[in-house]
Amino acid sequence: MPKKCRHLLQTSDLSLDEIKLLLKKASVYANDFNAVSLETKEKMHNKIIVALFFENSTRTVSSFEIASLRLGAKIVKLNMQTSSASKGETLTDTFKNIHAMQPDAIITRHAFSSAPFKLAEFSQCPLINAGSGVSAHPTQALLDLLTLYQHFGSLENLKGKKIAFIGDVKNSRVANSNIKLLQRLGLEIMLCAPSSMLPTTSLKTTHNIEEAIAFADILMSLRTQTERHNAPIFASLKDYGNAYCITQQRLKAHAKNKEVIILHPGPVHRDIDIESAVLEDERSKVLEQVKNGVAMRMAVLEFLLLD
C-alpha cells in the first residue's frame, strides 16, 4: 500500500483550524526568522526538498529555498532549462524519476492547472503546489492572509472587510486561490477589470477602478498576464495603466476608507499596476507580503514534514 501523506494543492486542503495553526506559527517566524526550535532543526536536518519549477519564479522559489534553509533542511532546485524536460521528457516521467530518489517533499510549479493534482495521485511524499496554470497558488493565498491577519489583528476582525481585486483576475491563480480562501473567512469581494480579464462569476464586478477603490478596505492589484493572452487586450501596457493603475490621485479622490491597504503578489509593473509613489506609501504591504512568504512557507514545510 502506498504511504499516505499530506499535500497542499489548494487552500481547501486545509481545515480552518489548520489555517489558524499555520497563521500562529508563521506569525512567530515573521517576527523572528531565527525562532526555529532546536527540536525542529534537528528533525529537519536530514530532510531533502526538491523544487521542480516549470515556469519562471523569483519570489516563490527564493522564499521556499530560504524557508527550507532556515528550518535546517536541504533543498535541491532543478533547472528545467537544462534538465531532460528540455529534451522531451514528459512532466510525469520527470516527476517519477525525481520521486524515485526519495526526497522528503517536492515543490512544483507548472503551466497546466491539472499538473499537481495528476502528480499527487502517485506521490508518496508531500507535494506542494507553488502555482498551477490559472487555478491555484495556495501558499501565496496563505501569505496574503498572514499579511491581512497582521494588519487587522485577528481573523474575526477580517470578517466583513471588503477586498477588491484589480487587474487580470481571469488569468490569475493568485486571485483564484485568494478568493476561495477569503470567502471562507467572510470577506466581501469585488473584481475589477476589463470584460476580457474577468471570469464568469457570481461575485460583484466592475470595469471602473474608481468604483473598486471606493468599495474597498483592501486593494489587491494583479499584473496583466500577457503570456496567457491569445491577443492583445490594450494597445500597450501604458494604455492599460491609464485605466487600471492604482495612483495617489485615485486613492485621494475615491477611497472612502483612507486607511485602505494595497497588496500585490508580484512582479509589479510599476506605474502600470501601481504608481511608484503608492508602492512607497505606508499603505503598501507589498514588501511585507514578500517577507511573510518566507515565514508562511516555513510554517507550511514544518506542518507537512513534521506534524
Curated annotation (Swiss-Prot):
The keyword Metal-binding does not apply. Pathway: Pyrimidine metabolism; UMP biosynthesis via de novo pathway; (S)-dihydroorotate from bicarbonate: step 2/3. Its EC number is 2.1.3.2. Pfam families: OTCace (PF00185), OTCace_N (PF02729). Carbamoyl phosphate binds at R59, T60, R109, H137, Q140, G266, P267. It catalyses: carbamoyl phosphate + L-aspartate = N-carbamoyl-L-aspartate + phosphate + H(+). L-aspartate binds at K87, R173, R223. Keywords: Pyrimidine biosynthesis, Transferase. The keyword Lipid metabolism does not apply. GO terms for biological process: 'de novo' pyrimidine nucleobase biosynthetic process; 'de novo' UMP biosynthetic process; amino acid metabolic process. GO terms for molecular function: amino acid binding; aspartate carbamoyltransferase activity. GO terms for cellular component: cytosol. Catalyzes the condensation of carbamoyl phosphate and aspartate to form carbamoyl aspartate and inorganic phosphate, the committed step in the de novo pyrimidine nucleotide biosynthesis pathway. PANTHER family: ASPARTATE CARBAMOYLTRANSFERASE (PTHR45753:SF6), ORNITHINE CARBAMOYLTRANSFERASE, MITOCHONDRIAL (PTHR45753). Belongs to the aspartate/ornithine carbamoyltransferase superfamily. ATCase family. NCBIfam families: asp_carb_tr, PRK00856.1. Heterododecamer (2C3:3R2) of six catalytic PyrB chains organized as two trimers (C3), and six regulatory PyrI chains organized as three dimers (R2). This is Aspartate carbamoyltransferase catalytic subunit. It comes from Helicobacter pylori (strain HPAG1). The lineage of its organism: Bacteria, Pseudomonadati, Campylobacterota, Epsilonproteobacteria, Campylobacterales. The gene is pyrB.
